[in-house]
């Protein structure tokens, strides 16, 4: 899977997209066959997959956290399942935020582990079994929708309202991970984050296909202290411009930005540049929670950058406050029906 989305994926399709179309067609065929025909293992407990249509960020991780909070409110013990992208460990691992680093398990699992039991595993089937053995009674899988390794009891596809599906082309012509029709067929519901127009066409198509549609916003968790502050905003995430908009919405004056690749591990020179530039201009450094975990536990100038950077925390808040609980309940009902069918009673 492509890890970085080139800028032309997010604009109207041009000659580059069309030049790559033969490769995209072949990629799409393979992806469709895998999604439709692969033998999926049955998870030991109810499983929600939080995925997206495209390469890159759409808000899956904060959505997964919101669902875990709803599960805990129901008296359940949720467990997160992640492949651990960006981490080096290739064995099934229960993530310990006090022990593991982003280089070990990936940055997103460290964020998830602050909320609930989290397992990283290259083989998601093994990871699901480990979560159940650790006491999880519902699994929330962060990404992996197109992998076709596990049966989902509920598949929620997240789409950003400002980016949508980019130019709508398949990898490598565009950011789409598998043919839209195949993805919709395997989806239970869509979650549109934000109120921009870029996702509307796909949302209407999904609604016509009978898929449930949810809407949410990304909400800042700040105390207003950023208002009027001159900042150097830095981020190594899939959509840094979205973060910079969030910083501006917090009232900060964004004097400069520094963007890095998603899941980027910072070099000493990059760290020194951020610290020295902010100090010379009198700017406050500000970043994302996901970037901060890649600095912790840090030493030397990495620790200095972590200490000098402010984090703007965010959460996903559904327009319908009951929506996360409804998703949990639907997942539990689907899992019960799945088990009845497996036992020959459905």
From Swiss-Prot:
Quickly give the catalysed reaction: a lipid A disaccharide + ATP = a lipid IVA + ADP + H(+)
Question: What pathway or pathways are given for this protein in its record?
Answer: Glycolipid biosynthesis; lipid IV(A) biosynthesis; lipid IV(A) from (3R)-3-hydroxytetradecanoyl-[acyl-carrier-protein] and UDP-N-acetyl-alpha-D-glucosamine: step 6/6
| Keywords assigned | ATP-binding, Kinase, Lipid A biosynthesis, Lipid biosynthesis, Lipid metabolism, Nucleotide-binding, Transferase
Q: Name one GO cellular component term.
A: plasma membrane
Keyword check for Lipid biosynthesis, yes or no: yes
**Residues annotated as transmembrane:** none
One GO biological process term? lipid A biosynthetic process
What EC number(s) does the entry state?
A: 2.7.1.130
Q: Which residues bind ATP?
A: 54-61
Catalytic EC class: transferase
| Pfam families assigned to the protein according to its UniProt record, in alphabetical order | LpxK
User: Any idea which GO molecular function terms this record carries?
Assistant: ATP binding; tetraacyldisaccharide 4'-kinase activity
- State the superkingdom: Bacteria
Function as written in the Swiss-Prot or TrEMBL entry: Transfers the gamma-phosphate of ATP to the 4'-position of a tetraacyldisaccharide 1-phosphate intermediate (termed DS-1-P) to form tetraacyldisaccharide 1,4'-bis-phosphate (lipid IVA).
Give the protein family.
Belongs to the LpxK family.
Protein name per the record: Tetraacyldisaccharide 4'-kinase
Q: What is the lineage of its organism?
A: Bacteria, Pseudomonadati, Pseudomonadota, Alphaproteobacteria, Hyphomicrobiales
